[in-house]
Amino acid sequence: MLDIKNISKTFNPGTVNEKRALTDFSLHLERGDFATIVGSNGAGKSTLFNAIAGCFYADTGSISLAGRDITFTPEHQRSRVIGRLFQDPLHGTAPHMTIEENLALAYLRASHGNPFSRISRADKEKFRAQLSLLDMGLEDRMRQPVGLLSGGQRQALTLLMATMVPPQLLLLDEHTAALDPATAEKVLELTQRIVEESHITCLMVTHNMTQALELGNRTLMMADGHIVMDVSGKEREGMTVDSLVAKFKAGTGKALDNDRMLLS
């Protein structure tokens, strides 16, 4: 499904600010894989997501999705088949538009429809039914501007918008980090349910080591712009946060330097 081969990315090459963000990075995901990614600050996690999403082109290597080479496909074209959620719950929705209008835009874009088309009554009922699955009462507030929603409600809505037409790939970039613990747990439950029920191929960056081991079917750890650990199956089932950290240190000779990760 997703096949990344030997991509590298250096920012500001040849200057005092030169930064090697990705180094000969390779990754293969099968359809329906749900892989969590952890790593210290500067490990290359966000750069990886930006490369996959098409925010910039990698210096070397290739990226294929569903058998199609997208290495040089523009970002706006990739967004039709790649869904993405960011850490900031305000990123991903139009605050001055209603819930219904936000859903309509997401639906028409993902289904390759005309964004200026009228939404049918059947589509509106579909939106209402999908909103009810969030269990937040949003199905009764479809005419309300999104800017009036809480951060958790907006993030749940963004998740729904990104998956209402299942994408070929879903990128979750610490999408619950800015939420309070109770809301974060609810959004994570929604995430796991939607991803598993729709068999969506998913990559999720998290700072929470427990989440990294409990969610999905693979855990990847990054350092210095490449994967240093990839655990799945029985090895992952028997792994604890302590053993994950110890394995990272043994494999890299480094300690995790992000206190927020270690304390989660």
Task: Go through the PLM ranges and name each one.
Residues 162-163:
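ABC ATPase C-loop
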Residues 38-40:
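The feature captures the beta-strand-to-loop junction immediately N-terminal to the Walker
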Residues 61-69, 229-231:
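Conserved ABC transporter NBD signature motif
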Residues 53:
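Helix-to-loop junction immediately C-terminal to a conserved catalytic motif
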Residues 15, 69-83, 91, 113-120, ...:
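ABC ATPase NBD coupling module
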Residues 206-207:
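H-loop/switch region of ABC-family ATPase nucleotide-binding domains
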Residues 226-252:
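Conserved beta-strand-loop-alpha-helix hinge in the C-terminal portion
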Residues 1, 10-24, 74:
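A short, flexible loop at the N-terminus of ABC-type nucleotide-binding domains that lies
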